[in-house]
Every structure is written in C-alpha cells, then in structure tokens.
Design a protein with these regions (language model features):
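Phosphate-binding active sites in nucleotide-utilizing proteins
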Residues: 1-2
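Active-site beta-strand->loop->alpha-helix modules in alpha/beta enzyme cores, enriched
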Residues: 6
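Charged catalytic cores and adjacent phosphate/nucleic-acid-binding surfaces used
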Residues: 9-167
Length: 167
C-alpha cells in the first residue's frame, strides 16, 4: 500500500509517522505555497527527503505547462538531487501531460546524479492511466535504464528498496 503526502512549508509531512510506518511506499509532494523563496523551498524539500519514511519525491517543480499553466517552483536542484541521492529517494517522472515534471533540464540533471526514478501516470480517472506510456517514452529519451526505474522492479524488490531506509 502507498500514499502521497504533502510536504508542509516547514518540511514536515502532513501525515503522522505511525500511519506512514504501516505503508510500503510514501510519495512526498508539495501542493501549497509553491512560490516560496528559492532557499526556503530548497530547505523544505531537503527536510522532507531526510525523513526515512519518504521513498519518492513527487512532481518536484509543481509546474503546469498547459491550460492556465503554473510556473515551476524555484529550488536548488543540485542540493535537492544530492539529498535524493544521499537518502535514496527516487524522483517521480510525472506522466500528466500538462505537468511534464520534471522538465527536461532537471530530468537530465537527475540522471547525472544517478537517481532512481518512479514513473507515475498521475491519473485521476481510468482513461488517464494510458499516460504511463508518455512517461516511459520520456524516460527512454532521457536515457534512464529500466534498472533505475523502481516501479519496473518485481514487487518484492520494490518493497524491499522502499523499506531499506531505517526509521
């Protein structure tokens, strides 16, 4: 079982540790205060990544490139991706077409950092599950090998990886 939790402005998660301890996968994402100053946003993200319950950093920029759009949050990607590497947190490759998150330049940087990835459709309705193929195409174009994509692994290996960070 898994959950997507909100990263609060102070870097805490919006769910209690006793709940998170019962889950196999925890995706941490920012859903509010997306316009924080760069240094504060970087600190917020790193604090969340240091939480041993966090397995995946979701839609890291929060941007939307279609419709009314939304600019990406500003953060120091080198510092955030270094934290992902240090704490073995995968980076979500969000397949929602209006997100395209992370953008290509951050995806390239994450590959350079040797990060693991989780491809996620971000589906909110059954017909949106087909977006997964878009994420797979982006991963292939970015040169991400299947072994760096955590959700291509057998379930037992995925759960073992997610449980490898001591709480």
């Amino acid at each position: 079982t898994g959950i997507e939790v909100d990263i609060l402005a102070n870097g805490d998660l919006d769910q209690e540790d006793n709940l998170l301890a019962q889950l196999d996968i925890v995706v941490a994402s920012i859903h509010s205060k997306l316009r924080m100053p760069r240094e504060e946003m970087t600190r917020r993200m790193v604090l969340a990544l240091a939480n041993p319950r966090v397995d995946i950093l979701g839609h890291c920029t929060g941007r939307k490139v279609m419709g009314s759009g939304r600019p990406p949050s500003e953060f120091d990607a080198e510092i955030v991706f270094a934290a992902c590497a240090r704490f073995d947190v995968a980076l979500e490759l969000n397949c929602r077409p209006e997100r395209q998150d992370p953008p290509d330049e951050l995806l390239e940087l994450a590959v350079q950092w040797g990060l693991n990835f989780a491809i996620d459709s971000d589906a909110h309705a059954p017909g949106q599950l087909e977006w997964q193929a878009y994420g797979c195409d982006r991963a292939a174009q970015a040169g991400i090998p299947p072994e760096k994509i955590v959700n291509t692994q057998p379930a037992i290996d995925l759960i073992a990886w997610a449980g490898s960070n001591p709480a």
